[in-house]
Amino acid sequence: MKKEFKIISELIANNTRVLDVGCGDGTLMKYLKDEKNVDTRGLEISKNNVRNCTSKGLSVIEGNAEKDLHQFPNLSFDYVILSQTLQAFYNPEKVIDDLLKVANKAIVTIPNFGHWKVRIHYF
């Protein structure tokens, strides 16, 4: 599991409800479900990732965060996670506003494009 996911999981209390936006293959969701008894849901844009998640028994729907977050009822989750995807949105401010409507707490991570391990690939 990615180090980042371990850090995120430490911020989330046991027995809570979490929406993972851009959940990818569901690795973090599965960990939270198995290790912290978290009720997880996912929103993912990739059909292949949605299929992969559902084959693991995870509750994931296909959707675009910029268009579909408003469909979730206000404060329907304790936490919402947006990991490593904020930079891909056309309107990140709207996405953040929508995240904060869906949950009491938002955990947002972004890539560190200045880190040497990232920059070394440019040379």
Where are these regions (language model features)?
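Conserved alpha-helix/loop element of class I SAM-dependent methyltransferases that forms part
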Residues: M1-N15
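Class I SAM-dependent methyltransferase "Motif I" SAM/SAH-binding loop
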Residues: G22-G24
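Class I SAM-dependent methyltransferase SAM/SAH-binding core
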Residues: Y31-D68
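A short acidic, Gly/Pro-enriched loop at the edge of an enzyme's catalytic core
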Residues: Q71-Y79
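A short SAM/SAH-binding and catalytic strip from SAM-dependent methyltransferases
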Residues: Y79-N91
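Conserved class I S-adenosyl-L-methionine
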Residues: V108-F123
